């Protein structure tokens, strides 16, 4: 028997790099999307941390009244944020080299754009990397489809909404209380609670939580016993085992009798597709709602829609919500405008019908 040996030609440095990038044997898969994802997410993370700790106040409304968001300027973890870029900048691209100085860039909220743009590119690439790894492993592509829901939500609040409103100062602040402020102002200006797409999103998130808890509790309650009473049931499962670890027939029978027969899935694949699709579709709709309200296609207005026989208004919850909206609109950006737009747009109300007599 003769064995022929042939020396393998040494691969070029570029070829070695390509093989390393696309190798599924690495502990963490890099991928071509990862080549862009890693530097952008690192840049966004580092800038966010530095800005959250030490950024000076930002003139968010463009009226020379800076708002402090960093820890070194008196905030804590709850109240701190990376403040959105100034209304004086609007939708202009504002990298460091566009400012006259670093102080000007910080004063106008440049770090916000740097973080948001790099973050969005990073999460887009993360989604592409999920598809890429699935493709390399011969899997179906639904993981990246599910991830597209939070990606769409982030894109809506950080990019689409500011574009629709005409300024990145209207984007969501990068902090806890700043997020809540964004939600209140969004409700005041767009009545999002009365928008059908937001309602679908609420059903998706809360329904997804309910279905996840129901599924987890049913599976845990119908595990196939493989251990004794003194051992943890978790030891009854061996990674990669071929046998079912729970009795789907028992779970189906229990739930079918608890509700009714057709409320229970008898197919594990369709069940898990439903668990994935419900919250994803809901969040898609919410993202679409944010994107339409960005261009002021707002929630339903049922204010003063119920009248008695004399034409007097009978207040409904829509009217209560409208009062809350006006209150929130009065409070926010109190120095940027003299009067809330919703109140200023109505007919003028006379405050004095006749001039008072003086010394006469």
Curated annotation (Swiss-Prot):
GO biological process terms, semicolon-separated: photosynthetic electron transport in photosystem II; response to herbicide
Record's miscellaneous remark: Cyanobacteria usually contain more than 2 copies of the psbA gene.
Species assigned in the record: Synechococcus elongatus (strain ATCC 33912 / PCC 7942 / FACHB-805) (Anacystis nidulans R2)
Propeptide position ranges: 345-360
Molecular function in Gene Ontology: chlorophyll binding; electron transporter, transferring electrons within the cyclic electron transport pathway of photosynthesis activity; iron ion binding; oxidoreductase activity, acting on diphenols and related substances as donors, oxygen as acceptor; oxygen evolving activity
GO cellular component, one term: plasma membrane-derived thylakoid membrane
UniProt gene name: psbA2
Subcellular location: Cellular thylakoid membrane
Positions with a binding annotation for chlorophyll a PD1: 198
Protein name, UniProt field: Photosystem II protein D1 2
């Amino acid at each position: 028997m003769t064995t022929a040996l042939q020396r393998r030609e040494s691969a070029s440095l570029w070829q070695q790099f390509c093989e390393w990038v696309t190798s599924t044997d690495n502990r963490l898969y890099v991928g071509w999307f990862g080549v862009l994802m890693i530097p952008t997410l690192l840049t966004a993370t580092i800038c966010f941390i530095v800005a959250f700790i030490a950024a000076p106040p930002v003139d968010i409304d463009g009226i020379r009244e800076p708002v402090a968001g960093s820890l070194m300027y008196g905030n804590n973890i709850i109240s701190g944020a990376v403040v959105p870029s100034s209304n004086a900048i609007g939708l202009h691209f504002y990298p460091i080299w566009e400012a006259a100085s670093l102080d000007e860039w910080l004063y106008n909220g440049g770090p916000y754009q740097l973080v948001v743009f790099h973050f969005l590119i990073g999460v887009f690439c993360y989604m592409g990397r999920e598809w890429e790894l699935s493709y390399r492993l011969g899997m179906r592509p639904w993981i990246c489809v599910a991830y597209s829901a939070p990606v769409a939500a982030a894109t809506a609040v950080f990019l689409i909404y500011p574009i629709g409103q005409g300024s990145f100062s209207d984007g969501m602040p990068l902090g806890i209380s700043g997020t809540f402020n964004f939600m209140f102002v969004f409700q005041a200006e767009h009545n999002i609670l009365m928008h059908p797409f937001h309602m679908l999103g609420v059903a998706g998130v809360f329904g997804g939580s309910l279905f996840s808890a129901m599924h987890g509790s049913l599976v845990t309650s119908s595990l196939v016993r493989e251990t004794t009473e003194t051992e943890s049931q978790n030891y009854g499962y061996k990674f990669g085992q071929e046998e079912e670890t729970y009795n789907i027939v028992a779970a189906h029978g229990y739930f079918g009798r608890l509700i009714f027969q057709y409320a229970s899935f008898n197919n594990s694949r369709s069940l898990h597709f439903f668990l994935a699709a419900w919250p994803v579709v809901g969040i898609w709709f919410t993202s679409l709602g944010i994107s339409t309200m960005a261009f002021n296609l707002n929630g339903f207005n049922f204010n003063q829609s119920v009248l008695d026989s004399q034409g007097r208004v009978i207040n409904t919850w829509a009217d209560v919500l409208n009062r809350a909206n006006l209150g929130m609109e009065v409070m926010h950006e109190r120095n940027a405008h003299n009067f809330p737009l919703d109140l200023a747009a109505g007919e003028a109300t006379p405050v004095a019908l006749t001039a008072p007599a003086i010394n006469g």
